[in-house]
Amino acid sequence: MSKDKITPLVDYSSSETSSSDGWCDEGKEVFVDDFADKPMDMGHVSGGWAGHVYLVVKESAGLRRISQACIEEICQRSDDAGTGKAETVECGQTSVIKEADIRSRVRRMEGLHVSLTRVFYLQEHEISGFVEILERAVLASSHGAFAVGFSKASMYANETGSREFVGLDIGSGEERLAKIVGAVDEVMRRFGKEPFFSNPRFHVSIVRAERGKGGRGMIGKGLGQAMHEEILALPAVQISQLECVFGNRRFCIAL
């Protein structure tokens, strides 16, 4: 991502350089998110189990529609820009063909969620105690289910730059999220783990894209104004469940 400025997930003021159409244009800020697709990919490592705490976001018809529209626009822009084309040489002649796997590298995210922790590690004998303390802390601070609304879309990437994401930034409901993060942070500190970012960018990643050949990004241009207006018009989504995963072990806490 030589043209992109990659910054940590920070507070919303850091996103002011984003384009007016609601998504970072090429050369603008790209926010680091190294756990957008982690819940299903983590497992046991020597010395501990990888953990992640997040709030479950139920996929609505509106989110599915926006996700698919983003995929279509990304693929179309990549094709128009030549990202989805490759040169081949046959019988001494060079031809340009469309890469067969362009769509396979851009896909809708499953298991939509809002992260509340970084990835952390616990010993197996610590897991049950952690979950019990986490449940008490969260229930004392969450005050039941609540709704969140979306303000705009931003471009995110993992730290290695191998994957990019379209994330819907959360606007309404941010205060409730901050209270829950505060409770989770206290539990993390109790177990000697690093708390979440001090001013997190709460978001839901809806589309992921693998980097193309030669490190070319699949996501690099802004969404159109019409798409931005659709995002703003999305109904609020209900948050009613927190999950904590350690490898293939999943613990659910109803708010």
Task: Give names to the regions the model predicted.
Residues S2-L255:
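Histidine-dependent nucleotide/RNA phosphoesterase domain, centered on the 2H-phosphoesterase fold
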